[in-house]
Amino acid sequence: MKKSFTFIVSVLLISVQLQAQTEPTAGNWKTWLISSGKDYRLLAPSSYKEEIAQVLARQQALDSAGWQQIIYWNAGAPGYRWHEMIDKLWTNDLSNNGALANMLLGTAIYDATVVAWDTKYAYNRPRPYVADKRVKVYAPKIESPSYPCEHSVAAGVASTIIGHFFPKLADSVNHMAERLMSSRIAAGVAFPSDTRAGFELGKAIALKEIERTKDFVTKTEWDKKLPQGPGVWNGKNPMFPTAGLCKTMVLESASQYRPGPPPDFAKEMDELRNFKQTFRSSANAFHYASQNTGADLLHKKIFEYNLHLNPPRAARAYALAAVSIYDCFIACFDAKYAYWGIRPDQYDTTYHPLVPTPPFPGYPSGHATMSGMIEVLYSYLFPTDRAIFQKVAKDGAESRFQAGIHFRTDNEAGLELGRKVAAAVIKKVKNDGADNNSGLTQQNRKH
């Protein structure tokens, strides 16, 4: 046990040498679903001097479980652990609500972080380890004022959003939030009042954004009418048949970039029949069929570019991705159910794909749509890695052909749709106050 404690403390002491780049003007950045950061500025905090004893007491009482919580919540940006959770939840949600839940987690954490940064620099409350040299610091030093706690802001948002859309998890996420807040106090980076204020701020912004988007998901029920005829999808119980009726966030409508009708797939069916599967092609097909590539890649790049040490800019990246995913989902399913494009194993019932065919029309490909979005949006956020994102888009789209569940035209149309959606999102935030034509501050570039 003693060796374990020594190792944990050494890891924490190494980590705190990392200096985060702050964004002192982030409180002025434009927000998504609230008017501005300034309009929601918190009231001034009371004196922190009486709270120093509480921080010291927490540190003196740290046990193994407390150390583990500090390490767990030190990882990534304030929203990192919550985005990891929602990534798994929304992609397995069978309603139209999953994509909205994912989007709101991104926009609400970002908007609440903007409010937090406005409040921080309005009052300039010092961090506990700055206010009193007896306080040790066991977390990366975020060079920004203490009030309110940015991790607690994200926790307030996440517990509210996840609890609302996935009510069975409400108790669990609230307990997680409590442990998070306790860990920030014990780590010496927040006073108890910082965590309480941050949590309540996050909760308030989340509730407001849930209310603002309450009519985004369509209430219209599917009429259960399946089209008939050659070249038309002919499965049973299609998933998300009304998703294209939902409101979009950036696009003027779900059909704004709807591709033209699909061609006759006779030649493309021949291409699939004649395709010679290799170890590499099957590996690519299985990889993209089983991984949430977009989410994993975004987490990775945020770490590589040290944006996890820059809470406002990390929150912005997560929000841009969440909004883009949401509009891509709506636009893609608008097109799917506008055309009811047939799948290869329906066009030729003797054809057997490598992976199971999803239960909805094929044109355009959802994977390809998300791949096109990744290529454009991530290249904006992390421009030096543009070639990586181009390859991911190409491989991701091609994987659906290699898997035998999409015609090539499905993928080409999807890539183009995703690129257009991402471009529209980027255009919207070009003047948000954070953009500097590259999406990154020079200090945060990967070395």
Task: Go through each PLM region and give its residues.
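Acidic/polar surface patches and capping/hinge elements
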Residues: Q21-H447
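Bacterial Sec-dependent N-terminal signal peptides
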Residues: M1-Q21
